[in-house]
């Protein structure tokens, strides 16, 4: 893990363009996931190498969505990069389609040990876990979060990572500064 005092999303060296593996889902309809990450990171001056974790007809807020889990292709997909000498400066992960995908992200960490590890643990919001997320997938995401250089959970995701209860009566949208600080300290203590 990188030293927090020296963390930068990227540092430009001359004409060098930093390369980010963006490990996230791709939605055909709805502004989220790789559809947002690719243009934002590109506008920030990064070369984005997408690694789709799932293909969605739309995000899960729309009724009747379809998901195709891409776990079975991820290893061959990223191993092909090794064959052509692709170098990665950051691994940015978001929505995952299955617990096994954490192993594919760890493979990227092992292949690119100096890459910045950015984890956006996309799995829940407003006290509710997304419909594709099982307890096993939430646990796997919490394990992945512990190895992040930069972690960007919302309040619900932070509670899940910390093993704190959430639900319909959960008021995680209005917390005190002291409670937010407690959660941040607990997340940092996890790794």
Model-predicted segments: where are they?
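Conserved N-terminal subdomain of the carbohydrate kinase-like
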Residues: 2-119, 123-131
């Amino acid at each position: 893990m990188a030293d927090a005092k020296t963390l930068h999303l990227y540092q430009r060296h001359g004409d060098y363009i930093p390369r980010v593996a963006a490990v996230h889902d791709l939605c055909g309809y709805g502004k989220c996931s790789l559809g947002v990450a690719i243009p934002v990171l590109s506008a920030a001056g990064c070369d984005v190498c997408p690694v789709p974790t799932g293909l969605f007809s739309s995000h899960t807020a729309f009724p009747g969505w379809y998901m195709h889990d891409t776990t079975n292709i991820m290893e061959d997909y990223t191993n092909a990069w090794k064959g052509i000498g692709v170098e990665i400066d950051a691994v940015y992960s978001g929505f995952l389609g299955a617990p096994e995908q954490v192993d594919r992200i760890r493979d990227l960490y092992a292949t690119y040990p100096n890459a910045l590890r950015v984890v956006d643990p996309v799995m829940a919001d407003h006290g509710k876990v997304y419909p594709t997320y099982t307890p096993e997938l939430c646990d796997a995401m919490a394990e992945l979060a512990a190895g992040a250089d930069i972690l960007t959970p919302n309040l619900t995701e932070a509670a899940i990572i910390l093993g704190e209860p959430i639900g319909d009566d959960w008021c995680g949208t209005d917390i005190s500064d002291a409670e937010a600080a407690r959660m941040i300290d607990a997340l940092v203590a996890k790794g």
